[in-house]
Regions:
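Class I SAM-dependent methyltransferase Rossmann-like catalytic core
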Residues: 148-196
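Class I SAM-dependent methyltransferase SAM/SAH-binding core
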Residues: 214-257
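A short acidic, Gly/Pro-enriched loop at the edge of an enzyme's catalytic core
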Residues: 256-268
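Conserved beta-strand signature within the Rossmann-like core of class I S-adenosyl-L-methionine
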Residues: 297-304
């Protein structure tokens, strides 16, 4: 294949069935795009002039397919890298029920962005393509830099209503299969959280998760930091019923109605201000209520299975100081959104 021949454009004028049609296409894309880094030659630099003199490539999609797979990485050598997620290794291993997960690795990079637009539901991305050798080299540089911002510019919208997808108003129902999928999908988050907090060498006592789901994430945190006290809220009665065994202080409530006092929390995890969980408007409304709960010099850590809806720049407008923007998992050789902010 020639450089830039790898990414398939979607042409469908109507929505595709998720498993029977979309996933089938995504398997084709994966087979065309994926490479094992051990099979790719090492290079010791990239030639920017060469790349920017290449013929640009155009990739197209619609916002009712998988637009949330398109991501931007910035800054890298003063430029913006565009990429697109391909089928997740967790899906291939049957550990999640979604086609994609939160992790990004080298084969998902496309090249340097030239321009992008969204018009009449159609997304058009024009970029200067990387070779596989360049993808490997660039990714190996990016994965060492915790300040690189991963931004997902496009949201999935329902074909008929044009609205963003959200979870049910009463929250998720609980079932053992969902619990397993949620657990597998956040293994890398748990590992990175433990590593990051241990490196800070600070004793965070009151830990709050306003949408704690099964409570197992907080339970895992407490195992690693046994002196902490965990508070877990969730919209779903079923989830809180399960979480009772895993959280020090569980409560069924909507995060926007959180009863916690301002300046009462040392560390808050936000794992639900994400695409397909809440819509963008509500993500901001909820965040405005929640961030004052954290004490000065406390931390807010934000990530999720799907893209974070609040932009890094907007977090900063609320007076939060960014410490890192992404996490890295060595086992999967993957990066993912992992925002850590200090409260002024």
């Amino acid at each position: 294949k020639n450089v830039g021949d790898f990414m398939y454009s979607y042409k469908n004028k109507k929505p595709l069935d998720y498993y029977n049609e979309l996933e089938k296409k995504e398997i084709e894309i994966y087979n065309d795009t994926y490479f094992n880094e051990n099979d790719i030659a090492n290079i010791n630099k990239i030639d920017l002039n060469n790349i920017f003199n290449r013929k640009t490539v155009i990739f197209e999609d619609y916002d009712y397919n998988l637009p949330q797979n398109i991501f931007l990485l910035k800054p890298y050598k003063g430029k913006i890298i565009v990429g697109r997620k391909i089928r997740s290794i967790l899906r291939i291993e049957n550990k999640i029920n979604a086609i994609n997960c939160s992790m990004i690795n080298a084969p998902m990079l496309l090249g340097f962005l030239k321009k992008r637009n969204l018009k009449d539901r159609k997304i058009k991305i024009e970029y200067y393509p990387f070779t596989n050798e360049e993808k490997k080299f660039v990714f190996d540089e990016i994965k060492k830099n915790r300040k690189i911002d991963i931004y997902y510019p496009y949201k999935y919208r329902d074909f008929y209503t044009g609205k963003e997808e959200t979870s049910p108003e009463t929250g998720w129902t609980f079932n053992p299969e969902k619990k397993e999928y949620l657990g597998y999908g956040e293994v890398h988050f748990r590992k990175f959280t433990e590593k990051f907090i241990k490196e800070l060498n600070t004793d965070y006592k009151i830990i709050y998760d306003p949408a704690c789901s099964t409570g197992e994430f907080l339970n895992d945190y407490k195992k690693n930091f046994p002196m902490s006290y965990t508070i877990g809220h969730d919209l779903s009665k079923e989830m809180i019923e399960y979480a009772k065994n895993y959280v020090d202080e569980p409560l069924c409530c909507n995060a926007i109605n959180s009863p916690l006092k301002n300046n009462s929390v040392d560390l808050m995890f936000l794992r639900f201000l994400n695409s397909e969980v809440v819509d963008t408007k509500n993500a901001y409304k909820i965040f405005k209520v929640l961030y004052p709960k954290v004490k000065k010099k406390g931390l807010i850590i934000c990530f999720g299975h799907t893209p974070v809806l609040i932009r890094k720049e907007m977090f900063q407008r609320y007076g939060l100081i960014p410490i890192i923007c992404n996490g890295y998992d060595k086992e999967r050789d993957a990066i993912f959104q992992f925002y850590v902010f200090e409260v002024k």
